[in-house]
Design a protein with these regions (language model features):
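N-terminal non-catalytic cap/leader segment that marks the start of a structured domain
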Residues: 1-39, 156, 218-222
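A residue-level signal for conserved active-site and pocket-lining positions in enzyme catalytic cores
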Residues: 19, 41, 73, 99, ...
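A generic local secondary-structure boundary/capping motif
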Residues: 5-7, 28-31, 56-65, 78-86, ...
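Structural signature of FAD isoalloxazine-binding scaffolds in flavoprotein oxidoreductases
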Residues: 32-51, 65-67, 214-224
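Non-heme Fe(II) oxygenase catalytic core, chiefly the N-lobe of the double-stranded beta-helix
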Residues: 46, 51-103
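Catalytic-pocket segment enriched in acidic/His residues
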Residues: 25, 56, 103-234
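Structural motif
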Residues: 13-16, 38-40, 46-47, 54, ...
Length: 234
């Protein structure tokens, strides 16, 4: 209890997030067929936060703060332009992240009114995930050899003790070799870079009525074989 946990990789070269990568989450958000290729975006290093740290509610977008519990992998070697067959050789281990998302402008995006056309809508969605402390990560990194099958892990997100997300990682649309091979065509990943593999179903924006986080709430994400990432909002 006296130990302060920082993000396991406090200053990676890159934090990369894959989006819409769980079948049931894709259905709850858009009900469209699975894409041909992965989709994703870069998050700032300043968004990283350790387990047990407080997620600060931003005054400019305080009302629609969402959770996204995600299974992550960490690179152990420099990786660029690799094949799917070789991709897992570059993975050092696994951890957990919460892709916290401020969604206050979602109603305007859905209206499609200026300045919220498709391009600006996507941009606002990504900006809402990049506020300081909006990528809690941890509590530890488990080495690759400690996880027999990364697609057979139980992932659960709890808000104030209530289960919000409850899934197995076998619902991933694009598995790790596909993600690594696809994005390494462009990016050069470095040791310590963190990749979040996408959120499962059960996010707050996908519920009716919506469920969002507020100051005083506690959000926990538990991944089988890794541990529990826990943060409060302040």
């Amino acid at each position: 209890e006296d130990t302060e946990l920082l993000a396991p990789i406090p200053n990676p070269w890159m934090v990369f997030s894959v989006g819409m990568n769980y079948g049931r989450h894709l259905a709850e958000m858009s009900n469209t067929p699975p894409p041909e290729h992965p989709s994703g975006f870069i998050k700032t290093r300043d968004s990283l936060l350790g387990s047990g740290k407080a997620i600060k509610v931003p005054p400019q977008c305080p009302d629609w703060i969402d959770y996204e519990g995600e299974f992550c992998f960490v690179f152990g070697r420099e990786c660029h332009a690799v094949s799917e067959a070789d991709a897992m050789e570059y993975v050092a281990g696994y951890t957990i992240a919460n892709d916290v998302s401020a969604r206050d402008w979602i109603p305007d995006i859905k209206k499609g009114e200026p300045p919220f056309g498709p391009i600006h809508g996507w941009e606002r969605n990504i900006l809402g995930k990049n506020l300081p402390g909006f990528t809690p990560c941890g509590p530890v990194i488990v080495t690759k050899d400690e996880i027999a099958d990364p697609y057979d892990l139980h992932l659960q997100t709890r808000l104030n003790g209530e289960v919000m997300q409850d899934t197995k990682t076998d619902d991933l649309i694009f598995k790790l070799p596909e993600i690594i091979s696809y994005y390494s065509q462009w990016y050069r990943f470095h040791p310590g870079d963190v990749v979040t593999t996408g959120s499962p179903a059960g996010v707050g924006i996908g519920r009716d009525p919506h469920v969002f986080m507020h100051a005083g709430d506690t959000i926990e994400i538990e991944l089988e074989g890794v541990g529990v990432l826990s943060n409060t909002l302040s």
